[in-house]
Amino acid sequence: MPELNKDIRWQQRFANFRKALAQLKKFVDKGELTELEEQGAIQAFEYTYELAWLVLKDFLEYQGQTDIYGSRDAIQKAFQAGIIEDGEKWMDAYVSRTKTSHTYNEETAREVVDAVMNDYYPLFIDLNRKMETLLDR
């Protein structure tokens, strides 16, 4: 794949990430959520998380990395490259994303929503800022 296409790919993915982040922000800004809104917040988290790790993967591949096979690899390599800072919280987000895709349990849902509001949303905001600076290069 030519360099130009790889460049466009991560930038296009980043644009989609920003749209997902804007949707997630609506839930975060609302604060107290009904059960139905919690389900919507979880879905918004899932979309945002998926796009976040794919942005990391595409950007790292643009930088020459080739051995990224999933979100865990992308997170680890992005942490090593200094793109993301809190590797532990990113791995917590990975675990939460796995939980939301394999089971629905009201208690788990509330735990995930709490983590999204307090931990993961700030991670996504930080990633957005970092990628904006890289976009401007």
Regions found by a protein language model. Give the residues of each.
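Solvent-exposed interaction patches of small proteins and small membrane subunits
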Residues: 1-137
